Regions:
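A short, acidic, flexible beta-alpha connecting loop/helix-capping segment that sits on the rim
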Residues: 289-295
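Acidic, low-complexity intrinsically disordered tails
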Residues: 309-313
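Canonical Radical SAM [4Fe-4S] cluster-binding loop centered on the CxxxCxxC motif
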Residues: 63-100
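Conserved AdoMet/S-adenosylmethionine-binding subsite of the radical SAM
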Residues: 109-118, 123-282, 288
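N-terminal [4Fe-4S]-dependent radical SAM core
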Residues: 18-74, 101, 105-115
Length: 313
């Protein structure tokens, strides 16, 4: 409420004619902080933000030696239905505007009093399902007159909307494209990701090759390690074969478990073994560093808890 009053006061300083023109042509939208969780190490903070229509979204701030990263949401909820993700539990409510995406970054910079140097569009929602606003956001946030973050420091994650990947490639931006793959074959992928019924892994890989040819940017493949589902030795070998000849980086993710979903994290030993096998096939592999494991780390968890507490779920 104070945030809204502050903006209204700024607008009242302008002429009546100017205010009427703004009212006819523009809508000012932003976010306000509702809740914040800080990890014990103080290197991670999770934010719950409310929008003008009182819907809520999440963002995460992560402090690294090389700079500060923010993971932002692109939609209120998500309609992709991945079985290991809390964001999909309530479905999709609506898309975020470019302004609402930008506002998450501005509010976190204001709260932390630190500059954000890296942006990850990997929070709630499927970014490419909100393509036009995502594109506006990227161009605005990388503009020198705005926050001025280099496109090379922006990562956009997608579950694999092939047509939109090709459209994004034609924009010839310098962002990093991250594919939420999470399976070495279509059979396993269909068990956990409904989008696999629409696009095969083969089609996604072809779109990734097109993206690389157009932009020269290496692709990242995100692979959540799910116990007993996709973490066996044969899965690692199959994944290596699938990605053969593609300029890519594989990011193994210890799964953030969601109690409403029957998915569990692979053991540390199995994750390390998986990594070793991929490296034998000369793949560039990292295991995502765990940050904020003592707070509601999984995407969508904090929002779900808030909605349940307030009888909105």
């Amino acid at each position: 409420e104070p945030y809204r009053r502050q903006r209204q006061m700024c607008i009242r300083d302008r002429s009546v004619a100017f205010r009427e023109k703004l009212k006819e042509n523009y809508c000012i939208s932003g976010v306000r902080q509702v809740e914040k969780q800080v990890s014990k190490k103080e290197d991670t903070a999770k934010y719950l933000f409310a929008l003008e229509d009182d819907h809520v979204i999440e963002s995460v701030w992560m402090k690294y030696r090389h700079g500060n990263s923010v993971c932002i949401s692109s939609q209120v909820g998500c309609r992709m239905g991945c079985t290991f993700c809390a964001s999909t539990l309530t479905g999709l409510t609506r898309n975020l505007t470019a302004g609402e995406m930008l506002s998450q970054i501005y509010q976190i910079q204001k709260d932390t009093k630190e500059r954000v140097s890296n942006i990850i569009v990997m929070g709630m929602g499927e970014p490419l399902d909100n393509y036009e606003e995502l594109l506006r956001f990227i161009k605005l946030v990388s503009c020198e007159k705005g926050i001025g973050i280099s496109q090379r420091n922006i990562t956009v994650s997608t579950c694999g909307l092939v047509d939109k990947i090709r459209m994004l490639a034609d924009e010839k931006l310098q962002i990093t494209l991250a594919i939420s793959l999470h399976a070495p074959n279509d059979e396993i992928r269909r068990q956990t990701m409904p989008i696999a019924n629409r696009y095969t892994i083969g089609e996604i890989i072809q779109a990734c090759k097109y993206y690389f040819d157009k932009t020269g940017r290496r692709i990242t493949f995100e692979y959540s390690m799910i116990r007993g589902v996709n973490d066996k030795e044969e899965h690692a070998k199959e994944l290596a074969g699938r990605l053969s000849g593609l300029n890519c980086h594989i990011n193994l993710i210890p799964l953030n478990e969601v109690k409403e979903r029957n998915c569990y994290r692979s053991t540390k030993e199995d994750i390390e073994k998986f990594k070793t096998i991929l490296e034998k096939y000369r793949k560039t592999v990292t295991i995502r560093r765990e940050m904020g494991s003592d707070i509601d780390a999984a995407c969508g968890q904090l929002r779900k808890k808030f909605l349940t507490k307030n009888g909105r779920n």
